[in-house]
Amino acid sequence: MKASIVLVSFLGLVSGMVLPGHRLSPSGAKLQPRSLFKREANLDYRYAPEPCRAILTTCRVTSDCCSGMKCVSADGESVCTPSD
């Protein structure tokens, strides 16, 4: 009897960690799916700006390039080059 209680408790603990579950929202009104990797639902990560562009990459203005570089137009294409 004691062994079966321990076994059922252990299986409940393991299944709670492995199987996807639900938890109550902070208000307690509705269930929310539980996730290990939570991302903000209202942010669009696809269009995040790049910190800066490296040498010989295309640019639109000098502020696109990394520090110490400038955007120069050559042969109809603008690229980041080291500033003198």
Curated annotation (Swiss-Prot):
GO CC annotation: extracellular region
Primary location group: secreted
Disulfide bonds: 52-66, 59-71, 65-80
Keyword Secreted found: yes
Keyword entries, A-Z: Disulfide bond, Knottin, Secreted, Signal
Leader sequence segment: 1-16
Cellular location(s): Secreted
Family: Belongs to the UPF0499 family.
Domain notes per entry: The presence of a 'disulfide through disulfide knot' structurally defines this protein as a knottin.
UniProt name for this protein: UPF0499 protein NCU07353
Protein source organism: Neurospora crassa (strain ATCC 24698 / 74-OR23-1A / CBS 708.71 / DSM 1257 / FGSC 987)
